[in-house]
Amino acid sequence: SSWSNADEGYILLSNNSSNIESWSKISLPMGPYGFDHNKYNHAASGDINNDGFIDVVVSITRDLPYYEGAYIQVLINDGQGALKDMTETNFFNQPRSQTHHGEGNIYLRDMNLDGSIDIIHSTRDYSSGYHGAHIAINDGNGNFNSITNDDLPNKPNSGYNNYDFLMKSLPINIDNEACIDFISVTDAGWENSTDETSNYLFTVLNTACNF
């Protein structure tokens, strides 16, 4: 079948052949900001509800206001390769979805070592009042709750922008102690090159796997 302007995205479902044109094309659910106003930044796949099928998590922002809002869409595999948008029931509370810069990467890692995949959305912002290091914990059934600001430290240096909340988060086991930690960064300003700080990386260690 042909591509349609009525759809915003597709999954190409392999039939185990190398002929991509013969693969099935499955329409994706529409994003939260209305048709043709969603900007899809990044996606990651994994079995988030432990049913044996691969699901997809998508980071989405909007076109107007430009890149305002950082939304995470949870798409659950029905077992036949079709993805159902379960965000309203599985990840309803998302305060960053309206007033947080929308650019960022999605990572799926088991942050608290409970056997279920959690979501890490690596973003940045200067005014929302939320960390750009966004970690959402899975309850084991594919339902997510974001950890609070108080569960994470502020930046050791607020930087040129005088903003204390964390920018970015790359999940990695830094200290080889089983728990997943992450690397963050100060975000240099660019408005005045004579006053801006230099970017530098710093680590946040998850010492008890208790996110």
Predicted regions and their residues:
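Acidic/hydrophobic-patterned starts of short beta strands in beta-sheet-rich repeat architectures
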Residues: 1-2, 50-60, 113-122, 176-185
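Short glycine/acidic-enriched loop and turn motifs that connect beta-strands
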Residues: 3-6, 62-66, 124-128, 188-192
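A short loop-to-beta-strand structural motif that recurs across blades of beta-propeller domains
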Residues: 8-12, 71-74, 132-136, 200-203
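Blade-edge motifs of beta-propeller repeat domains
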Residues: 12-38, 76-101, 137-164, 205-211
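Beta-propeller domains
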Residues: 35-41, 59-63, 67-70, 122
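Beta-propeller blade termini
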Residues: 39-48, 102-113, 165-174
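Calcium-coordinating acidic loop motifs
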Residues: 47-49, 53, 78-79, 110-112, ...
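Blade-level signature of beta-propeller repeat domains, shared across WD40, Kelch, NHL, RCC1
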Residues: 170, 179-211
